[in-house]
Structures are given as C-alpha cells and as structure tokens.
C-alpha cells in the first residue's frame, strides 16, 4: 500500500459565510494548495472546525473538495469523534465519497483506557478500506496513545501513520525502533518540524501552509536534499508566523490571516470567536514583514 501520509500536508481551514459553507472560498483555498504542489490536503480536521460541522455539511465539504482536487493531490478527511458509532459513519462516508485516507484522534472528553482507544480504532479500521493516520493531540483529546497502543494499532494493516502534536521529540525514534512496517510519523506542530524530522519524522501537517504553502514546501525540499542550512534559514524566517498563528486557539488566527489575504470571510463558529484586535495586528504585521501574497 502506497503511504500517502508524508511530506507537506496542509490542515485546511473551512470557510463559512452567513453560517453556511462558503464553497466559492473553498475552491480558492484548495486551488491555492494545488498551485503550490503540497503533498496532500487534510479536510475537516481541528483546523477545519470539524466539531462544528453537521453530518450533511461534512459530506458536502468532502464532496466539493474531491471535485475541486480532481485527483491532483491526495485528500485526507478528519474522522474524529468521541462517539465510536459516529466516527465509523464519518469513515464510511469518507470512503463512499472517494477521499484517499483519513485521520482520527482518540475520543475526547470520555477519557477511554488504552484498550478503549484500541477498540475505537479497530472499529474504524473495520468500517472502511482506506489508509488511516492516527492523530495524537493530547491537549485536545485529554488522552493520548501510549507507545504500546501505537505498536498494537500498527499491526492493523491499514493503520500506517501517526500525526503527533505532542512535544515528545524522542517519540519518533521509539516508534521507528518498534514498528516493523512502512509506518510514517509526522508532526502537527509547525515550529518543531525540523527537530521532529531529524528524529525520524517524514513531514508535517501544517497550519501555516494555508497561507504560505510555497515557503513550507521549499523548507521541506531543502531539508530532504540535506540542505540543513537553507532549511534552517527558512524555518527561522517563519518562526514569527508560527507564533502569531497560535497567539489564540487554532484556527482563530489562521482564519483571520486567510481573510486578510482575501481567501475567505473571517467567520468562525462558536464557541470560538474571531481574533482580538491585538492578535489581528500581530498577524497583519508578520504578513507584511514576510511580504505574503496569495
């Protein structure tokens, strides 16, 4: 099985207008990613405000994205839920619509045991025939995969990757030492991408690449060509942007940045609220200083 979970994967924002999906803005957003040749796009993840979407909106978002992409790049869907039955329904619908793989986190809020996490993903694995990327986001889920659970889950044939949003930079080394198959590990934190990849990662799912996919792609290309100095120079240049995009809860800042650059409306769903004036100013300043344009 070809492993699609590698390289630069953009965790896309979901555009809204008048509390509905803005499909015209979605086309602009997706085509911007295709233009700059990202390796894949992630639809309806945390950055895509997945928890605010109805099932019908989720289907429409995926269907429209699949039509826009038209097989140019892989599409990964988010299938996270604290309800295993609902998560299975998301996975089954993703398969039906024709995405290329999906990602899911451990169920949030309910605090399952490690065995419960395993059974949740076993159920998702049985619900579809797509490749699956585990999503470690302990600050959002409240629970995380143990290394032992990752090893156990990796023995299911279609669980082939881990997106890690934690801060344990030794983890890629430990996983690579124990998982004996084509199992890719990616960071979900823009600011640690080089350190993470130096420890065995193979790319990252990026928030910043919503607006600078070209620069993020260049960074990763330099790293993969062993141009460490060049990659570090780009990474250092982007560090203030990474900081600005997490000055408030994701995706509040990136949604404003996309609005400021003309990609979509600055509309975000409750309980999230739009960025404060101080955050907006910080984002505007870094966009200006980096000469970011769409």
Curated annotation (Swiss-Prot):
Enzyme Commission code(s) on record: 4.3.3.7
Subcellular localization: Cytoplasm
Function statement: Catalyzes the condensation of (S)-aspartate-beta-semialdehyde [(S)-ASA] and pyruvate to 4-hydroxy-tetrahydrodipicolinate (HTPA).
GO molecular function, one term: (R,S)-4-hydroxy-2-oxoglutarate aldolase activity
Family: Belongs to the DapA family.
One Pfam family cited in the UniProt record for this chain: DHDPS
Residues that coordinate or bind pyruvate: 47, 205
Gene that this sequence comes from: dapA
Enzyme class: lyase
Protein name in the entry: 4-hydroxy-tetrahydrodipicolinate synthase
Pathway assignment: Amino-acid biosynthesis; L-lysine biosynthesis via DAP pathway; (S)-tetrahydrodipicolinate from L-aspartate: step 3/4
Site residues (Part of a proton relay during catalysis), renumbered to this chain: 46, 109
UniProt source species: Rickettsia peacockii (strain Rustic)
Highest taxon of the lineage: Bacteria
GO biological process: diaminopimelate biosynthetic process; glyoxylate catabolic process; lysine biosynthetic process via diaminopimelate
Catalytically driven reaction(s): L-aspartate 4-semialdehyde + pyruvate = (2S,4S)-4-hydroxy-2,3,4,5-tetrahydrodipicolinate + H2O + H(+)
SMART domains in alphabetical order: DHDPS
Alphabetically ordered keywords of this record: Amino-acid biosynthesis, Cytoplasm, Diaminopimelate biosynthesis, Lyase, Lysine biosynthesis, Schiff base
HAMAP family in UniProt: DapA
GO cellular component, one term: cytoplasm
Subunit description: Homotetramer; dimer of dimers.
NCBIfam families, per database record: dapA
Active site: 135, 163
